[in-house]
Amino acid sequence: MEVVDIDARAAKLGIDWSQVNFDSIQLPPGEDFGIESDDEAVYQDDQSEFDTGFGNIIVVDHLPVVPKEKFEKLEGVVKKIYNQLGVIKENGLWMPVDPDTKMTLGYCFIEFNTPQEAQNAKEKSHGYKLDKSHIFAVNMFDDFDRLMNVKEEWEPPQARPYVPGENLQKWLTDEKARDQLVIRSGPDTEVFWNDTRQKAPEPVHKRPYWTESYVQWSPLGTYLVTLHKQGAAVWGGADTFTRLMRYQHSMVKLVDFSPGEKYLVTYHSQEPSNPRDASKVEIKVFDVRTGRMMRDFKGSADEFSIGGPGGVAGASWPVFRWAGGKDDKYFAKLSKNTISVYETETFSLIDKKSMKVDNVVDICWSPTDSILSLFVPEQGGGNQPAKVALVQIPSKVELRQKNLFSVSDCKMYWQSSGEYLAVKVDRYTKTKKSTYSGFELFRIKERDIPIEVLELDNKNDKIIAFAWEPKGHRFAVIHGDQPRPDVSFYSMKTAQNTGRVSKLATLKAKQANALFWSPTGKYIILAGLKGFNGQLEFFNVDELETMATAEHFMATDIEWDPTGRYVATAVTSVHEMENGFTIWSFNGIMLYRILKDHFFQLAWRPRPPSFLTAEKEEEIAKTLKKYSKKYEAEDQDVSLLLSEQDREKRKALKEEWEKWVMQWKSLHEEEKLVRQNLRDGEVSDVEEDEYEAKEVEFEDLIDVTEEIVQES
């Protein structure tokens, strides 16, 4: 249909194009109704490459040039190499021969069953050293069309005029010092201000079908990432949420940012055609600002499945663990008996080789420094003990090591400031029939990194949850038997013991199975999720007192806002009822509740660290009353405004009621004659004051019975 036909059809239907906002039109995922989008324009060239039919063919160059007598021997060597990397089709290897000299030309074509096998063979064999003089150069057959179309004369790129972008930190300058949160329900993704003064969220941005799976904030809150079948996209701003960059990675399933937001890692897995084979995994690392792909990694899910809490198709996520701090200098991958640490300057291995650590099963970076902790379980049937070690990067020097005996399992927990490392150690009893738990506590910032051993009062108690106080020196442990475990608080330094761990208190028989510290410390929520149906206890650890107890029935998620002033509890669509979220104050006062059908996700927008020095923050804390007067006055104004709004609302309701009563009386009067005719002329609409009420009393004798009582 041409433009003229469209205009004619619109005129016939009475549609005024000037009144139509095309930016507000959103189509369901995968449906374009024949309208080409800007995404299709970007990926059109790439899509056409997959339709050539030669995607399963590779070209291997730098082969030896041999005569006819050695042809079969060379062909056998090449087949032996590439049969390990994929299935070569029958007659799928062709080695051209010079018709005059009868010598091979030094290259060959190999056709595999699938494009995936061809791509894998290219990745694995490019640079393969057959001997000193012959190092393979491998390309996809389809690449030659692209290379042949390169113009011989270089044309300088056209300079684009500079267009200043939006201030991506503008949302931090909100006059009311509010925080933003994003929610997903049904097809909609919505961003709100958390406006507790108004007892309701203030809408910022809403878009249906904004993402095809989930959304995720970057660690410092600058970007919001969405996932699509073509790849990932990041958006930014305080309220506009304009698209800043796209990252091409077909059917992306997971993303992860580096701590300083410089890099974005995307993940895609593909199920194999043969159920016995492992899934194929492709991971790409992009520069967030430029969109340039810095490195990609490909392989089977088995190669990416060691360590970590789990992911998609058997691969652990995140596959790459980023070193602490905002420099984004190093990231590591755990493989079988190997730890590969890469530097982002060249995106290659440090010292061009991986660290060999036999039987290593878990690694964890310090949140602030380039220190890597690792856990190696027992080997040789217990003859070789388990160990936890701290390794400095990039020097790979071992800073500290602790051997552990009779170990069943270990979990490592870094404190947010990188000052402490807690290692929960599950050990076998002497009979090997059960386990008990304890902690190895590393003081990272102290000389020689001293280690303390902590055992619970009842070492047979099962440890249900552990959590460090953010930016603090305390930690909490839930331990004991369900449904009423105990909660204990410990401190790494007290006024009496600055260098030893001390127990502060134990709370007996609590309905809790999860711990949620405030981001600023001091306050913690003892939460009973899942089987406990959303029991909440807001606890002040400084005073060791409960501030409030509450319940959010069937709550599945709890998340503090980045300032520690408010906390959100949510019931997601895993439950069919009561979907939505509730906002609470830090001390357990419910502020407002929002119900949303098919509610999937809630995430607060993170804030970057404060630019104020510790001394300046301490100074502000001392003079807080001076600053608080302004906000107290604003709160009072808002309270008066809300009261006035409530009065206006009640007044409007009263006027509406009185209007309805007058309408009813008017209608009643109009129908008076009709009612009188229906009652044969009897006038029944008589006011109450025309009647006289009399009170009449009467007695009715029902029965009489006589009894003779004898005196004793």
From Swiss-Prot:
One of its GO terms (molecular function) is translation initiation factor activity. Keywords: Acetylation, Cytoplasm, Initiation factor, Protein biosynthesis, RNA-binding. The keyword Magnesium does not apply. Residues 56-143 form the RRM domain. Disulfide bonds: none annotated. GO terms for biological process: formation of cytoplasmic translation initiation complex. The modification N-acetylmethionine is found at M1. GO terms for cellular component: eukaryotic 43S preinitiation complex; eukaryotic 48S preinitiation complex; eukaryotic translation initiation factor 3 complex. It is found in: Cytoplasm. PROSITE patterns: RRM. InterPro entries: EIF3B (IPR011400), eIF3B_RRM (IPR034363), Nucleotide-bd_a/b_plait_sf (IPR012677), RBD_domain_sf (IPR035979), RRM_dom (IPR000504), TIF_beta_prop-like (IPR013979), WD40/YVTN_repeat-like_dom_sf (IPR015943). Belongs to the eIF-3 subunit B family. Component of the eukaryotic translation initiation factor 3 (eIF-3) complex, which is composed of at least 13 different subunits. Binds to the translation initiation factor TIF3H1. RNA-binding component of the eukaryotic translation initiation factor 3 (eIF-3) complex, which is involved in protein synthesis of a specialized repertoire of mRNAs and, together with other initiation factors, stimulates binding of mRNA and methionyl-tRNAi to the 40S ribosome. The eIF-3 complex specifically targets and initiates translation of a subset of mRNAs involved in cell proliferation. HAMAP family: eIF3b. This is Eukaryotic translation initiation factor 3 subunit B. The gene is TIF3B1.
